[in-house]
UniProtKB/Swiss-Prot annotation:
Keyword Cell inner membrane among UniProt keywords: no
HAMAP family with a match to the protein in the record: Ribosomal_eS1_euk
Subunit structure, interactors included: Component of the small ribosomal subunit. Mature ribosomes consist of a small (40S) and a large (60S) subunit. The 40S subunit contains about 33 different proteins and 1 molecule of RNA (18S). The 60S subunit contains about 49 different proteins and 3 molecules of RNA (25S, 5.8S and 5S).
Protein's name according to its UniProt entry: Small ribosomal subunit protein eS1
GO biological process, one term: translation
Coiled coil, from the record: none
Source organism (scientific name): Penicillium rubens (strain ATCC 28089 / DSM 1075 / NRRL 1951 / Wisconsin 54-1255) (Penicillium chrysogenum)
Pfam families found in the cross-reference section: Ribosomal_S3Ae (PF01015)
């Protein structure tokens, strides 16, 4: 009889499955906090694998980008067509402190703005804020009928489009380069820049639906924890103790 393995004996029983471990048992839940620029601070929750060995949970969370509707952040449905990107920069306890990372329009809103019989004017410019954030802002505008106009179309001439585009870039440059990122966010929420462009270009050609449709963050300065905590309404110097007043002691003279 030949000596060898008995294949029938070495086979295991069919149907026995490996015990599966639920991956969510190894995860922790963290709260995502928006900057104090927005009305609603609580964005939501995010999951991350618990710290084990050399893998730190905080390192996995830092740099995560969340896309949130501006309507949820401002409690106003009028802002539903705008999306804000928030980037996690610091972890404090179970809270992820975020900073502004960009802004964009929803696709359906952009498609609804483009119509027949009008000119579409676009402009983009790269600006640097006073706190050294390098941003690229994209503006969009559409021509509209003049008062008492009978003509169906509202097409602007090439020279008028160039003049409007020049005016748009000048206004964006002026408004964005003279403020911090937080102050610029305050301007973007109520469409301050769009209204300023619409008002300034009335003499060239009347405009409508003027928006900063997209903000792209190109470069951030060196991370500053104090600035981030100030943005979230906190302070890095909260742990300082109170000044203790010492009792008065009489001075003793060595010689009269």
């Amino acid at each position: 009889m030949a000596v060898g393995k008995n294949k029938r004996l070495s086979k295991g029983k069919k149907g026995i499955k490996k015990r599966t471990v639920d991956p969510f048992t190894r995860k922790d839940e963290y709260s995502v906090k928006a900057p104090s620029t927005f009305q609603t601070r609580d964005v939501g929750k995010t999951l991350v694998n618990r710290t084990s060995g050399l893998k730190n949970a905080n390192d996995s969370l830092k740099g995560r980008i969340f896309e949130v509707s501006l309507a949820d952040l401002q409690n106003d449905e009028d802002h539903a067509f705008r999306k804000v990107k928030l980037r996690v920069d610091e972890i404090q306890g179970k809270n992820c402190l975020t900073n502004f990372h960009g802004l964009d329009f929803t696709t359906d809103k952009l498609r609804s703005l483009v119509r027949k019989w009008q000119s579409l004017i676009e402009a983009n410019i790269t600006v640097k804020t006073t706190d050294d954030y390098l941003l690229r802002l994209f503006a969009i505008a559409f021509t509209k009928r003049r008062p008492n106009q009978i003509k169906k179309t509202t097409y602007a001439r090439s020279s008028q489009i160039r003049a409007i585009r020049k005016k748009m870039t000048e206004i964006i440059q002026r408004e964005a380069s003279t403020c911090t990122l937080s102050q610029l966010t305050h301007k973007l929420i109520p469409e301050v820049i769009g209204r300023e462009i619409e008002k300034s270009t009335q003499g060239i050609y009347p405009l409508q639906n003027v928006h900063i449709r997209k903000v792209k963050l190109l470069k951030s300065p060196k991370f500053d924890l104090g600035a981030l905590l100030a943005l979230h309404g906190e302070s890095a110097t909260d742990d300082k103790g109170q000044k203790v007043e010492r009792e008065f002691k009489e001075t003793v003279l060595e010689s009269v």
